[in-house]
């Protein structure tokens, strides 16, 4: 789950946006500028990223769910891959308004998608070619819109967002519902309202991969720790029972 300063440098995490686009609220996290490009202070970014991973690990250990969000072109495949590896829901295409605040309606769409997939597996020979085409188009649209959250039965316990400026609606919905936010914030956006800020480049695919991999690793590690704790607890109970029986025999 560890990430080094060198890895951040190699991924280009320190490269911000052009100075003319900067958000003054990011001033505490900016080291300086070079060739009119802001340089993000990795001495700030690294410990803040570690804090975010620690939170993700603890939440996962407590059986919490983290929704991973990254719909920018350079983030889509990375987010989907890492979320699948970690076994958590994700949004990689577009954020549907009300995905959180109107989750009841979204659950209806999820139910529809699952029913259609079951119908597809059973075979579509009973309907006409035209109906099959309409069916195919609908299921493709549902897969694109909500495929990544089809196993999310309730609201997430936290959200990880790459590029807070690009996902303003998702952030507003999370804040409205009091859902904690982990967010990658570049030099041109505001960190205000983000619970776990990761100051860094949100455009480089290498940087995006570093963030997503780190959060996914933290989730997996937290889950593994939880399983180990359960195994230890069960083993301890078994040992206690054995001792009691032995004492009774004496």
From Swiss-Prot:
**GO molecular function annotations of the record:** structural constituent of ribosome
| CDD domains, per the entry | RPS2
| Source organism, top-level taxon | Bacteria
Q: Provide the GO biological process annotations.
A: translation
Does the entry feature the keyword Ribosomal protein, yes or no? yes
Check the record and name the SUPFAM superfamilies matching this protein. Ribosomal protein S2
Keywords for the protein's UniProt record, in alphabetical order: Ribonucleoprotein, Ribosomal protein
Q: Keyword Ribonucleoprotein, does the record have it?
A: yes
Q: List the disulfide bonds.
A: none
Show the InterPro entries listed in the entry: Ribosomal_uS2, Ribosomal_uS2_bac/mit/plastid, Ribosomal_uS2_CS, Ribosomal_uS2_flav_dom_sf
Q: Which family does it belong to?
A: Belongs to the universal ribosomal protein uS2 family.
Q: What PANTHER family does the annotation carry?
A: 30S RIBOSOMAL PROTEIN S2 PROKARYOTIC AND ORGANELLAR, SMALL RIBOSOMAL SUBUNIT PROTEIN US2M
Q: What is this protein called?
A: Small ribosomal subunit protein uS2
The protein's organism comes out as Polaromonas sp. (strain JS666 / ATCC BAA-500)
Encoding gene per record = rpsB
